[in-house]
Amino acid sequence: MQIEKYYNDLNTLHINTEENRAYYMPCSDIENARKGTNDRKQVLNGEWNFMYYTCIDDVPEDFKDGNTDGFDKIPVPSCWQTQGYDRHQYTNTRYPFPYNPPYVPYDNPCGAYLTHFESDNDYRKYLNFEGVDSCFYVWVNGEFVGYSQVSHSTSEFDITDKVKNGDNILCVLVFKWCDGSYLEDQDKFRMSGIFRDVYILNRPQKHIRDYKIETDIQGKINIEIDSDTDVSFVLENEKGEIYSGDSKTITVEKPILWNAEYPYLYTLYLVTEDEVIREKIGFREIKIDDGIVFLNNKPIKMKGVNRHDSDPVTGYTISREQAEKDLKLMKQHNINALRTSHYPNAPWLMQLCDEYGFYVIAESDIEIHGTASFFGGSQAVTFGLLAQNPDWENAILDRVQRNVIRDKNRTSVCIWSLGNEGGYGVNFEKAGRWVKEYDSTRLTHYESSMWQMEGHINDTSMLDVESTMYADYKWIDKYFENPGEVVWHRVSLGKGSEYGGAGEWINLSESKLGKKEKEQMAVVKPYMQCEFIHAMGNGPGGIKEYIDRLYRYDGFFGAFAWEWCDHAIDMGDSKYFYGGDFGEYPNDGNFCVDGLVYPDRRPHTGLLEYKQAIKPFAIKSYSNIMVVENRYDFAELDDKLYFEVNGERMEFDVPPRGKKSFPRPNGDVVMVKAYQKSDTLWAKKGYEVGFEQLIVNDNVPKLEPVNADGSFEVSEQGRNITIKGNNFEYIFDKSTGNFKKLSDAVTRSVEWNVWRAPTDNDRNIMRDWINADYHREQSYVYDCTYDVTDTVTIKCHNALIPVVQRKHMDIETVWTIYANGIIDMQSSVKVGENLPVIPRFGLRFFTKGENVKYYGYGPYESYSDKHLCTYLDEFNTTVSDMYEPYIKPQENGSHFGTRYVETENIRVSSDTPFSFSA
């Protein structure tokens, strides 16, 4: 098929598309608008004719005329990879094609789509595609309509002159790649096709084209209208109509303000002679004062998450039900903010965020990460290639504009993000300035401004917030240590730092920078982490250190976990595939399996941990009182929650962001649980919001008292020391420094243990572990003696030394065996120098049975840096139930802070808390 190669043409981003506008659904009258029936919307979703081609050369010329010979059927919306065409590919930063901008490979797969639709009216007809990856050509009844790209934005065509009464043929040719694909290098499975809704809006000849609604906290609504017909307005609250008229400025007395805790919305109807548009709007105002982010004149904290459109069965295609399930789960786990990583979500999802109460960072459909992945490339040298190239100015600006203009009326959108990981340069600086000129009511963000390309001095004056990814919490301390004087200086080649980015800390008063650069750097901006606590596999850990700082520093206003869900493909039979499982190159393995929830939305323990870390209250114990902190920004604590303290209901009347003291009940352990006080969109009254366990006295049940009465029979033969008592028989192996028999409790010799299965987030340190041969440790015994009195005492000096390596550990242990069979172990360990951190250290027992009882942190897996979602208690469980089925097998199921553990055959206790797994 011969077509114009717009997919390789930077000067042709769109042909015959309508101007960008706000998202809305027109209705015929106010009653239909009130019901949300959208009777002017003709939905074209459904089963379409489809054929997949590996190259445009294979597409028949008469396709656009309606020839469907040999075509299959495909659901629209969908991704063609999820329907059995092409193959799946996951790549993080590397482009899936040669870097040769703006050109894409000649053999560029494409999908030919064809459907029929009926027309029986004289309305103007606007054909809408809410999401097509990557670019597409459109024909109606054999006539060319237009071309568009930008996968995650709406493209609208006026097809009025192409449509006839009766049956009409719509043909769409979608390409896998286009020049825009260089700007869509997001970390995700790469999928293609018409993946969002397709519909026609039937509209009168004269109608509203666009509008912009701005509110303030004094109750004023300002409306800008682009319309060729008269417009009037009706405003309603939950009780009914409060305004009707044609003024574009409406004032509401004592408005109820919108925030994430009380997402109150008014309903505004835009009424013309033949059409009505309904908008849900909230009164809210976001601003910065003295480096602090305020909403409605109150400082706020965004406790957020990054969310991709991802489903193991449907891919990018996400229904309202799927999206609403995500939002409900987020709110159930105390998440109040969302970053649309790294592209605009479906437009109706933003409306849901208004209703559920989320602070949204709306991100443009831009990521250019592949430019930093070249051989010899880096963030400082090649990351900004397209960001600096004037040929790409319009393409970058177009994507930013489409994001902002579409969602400009969404109350939940508080911050515009220019994109993600695209380097920095003049193209983003121009786009940022356009955003500030177009919309001064919201904040601007772009994390990649942290990177400075050689030969360029970044201008970040149009960016309102300072943003980093995965900065060490010590970096955050430094940022707030002496703001405005000791500052982070972006430099092209970087010198290494605790953040790891290209820059260094400098004292402005002592630096030799130019006046303009100094003035810009002296501006103290609010700080956020647009990505933190990488949730891959058994993680994230160390959340508390970040959340402590979120509340310690007024200027630290937000942190967004990476990321919401595991990306994987459901292959049936409980199998999930990830990168490389489809034989694709390049691929980045299981790096996409990095969510707080499994692909099917079962919560990981990491989500439970995050829920506890960001719960809307904190309680500390001092002497005989409890200090209760309300971490809501707007709500009185007793308006949202009721508490049970050791099972007794209580309410704490603490003001927003306030603290108050209350008497603490008696007891060694005080358990405080918080419950939702009323029904919400995401949970019923009585839903548990979080808990706090106060350990007053750590009185743990001990092992039975040592009984010295009784007799021993001790013998030595070769390497074995055999100890027999009334009801036990132990054999100690002098060659390993450990027991090889403990009656029937173990099935093989006890082992010294250093190695464990690496977690996904161990991917870097794991190389050092393997190079150090931690998985090959052998015990070498220097000396082993024993003595018999009323006990048996074995003293052993041994070392752990792998083949090839020098000594890793020197161990001296005293074992004392009592007449009742209890074994006491005292061990001192000296670790060798210049070794990587040890995965773990302890003893490995090979026991029988399933049942386990322990006193420690449970019931979920727990670790020294990941146990907020667990509490100290005695638990009865099984080995199977302690297993956490991560998609890629790894370390799991450990229990931190254990005082004792008991299987069917053995019991271990310690004066010092320990961890165990089974």
What are these regions (language model features)?
Residues 27-36, 146, 548-738, 825:
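Carbohydrate-binding surfaces of carbohydrate-active enzymes
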Residues 161-167, 226-289, 668-716:
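Extended acidic/polar, glycine-enriched regions
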Residues 5, 11-14, 18, 34-35, ...:
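Accessory beta-strand-rich segments of carbohydrate-active enzymes
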Residues 78, 82-118, 123-129, 133-140, ...:
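Active-site-adjacent substrate/metal-binding segments within catalytic domains
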Residues 222-224, 327-330, 337-598:
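Substrate-binding/catalytic cleft of secreted carbohydrate-active enzymes
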Residues 82, 87-89, 94-103, 149, ...:
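An acidic-aromatic loop/edge-strand motif
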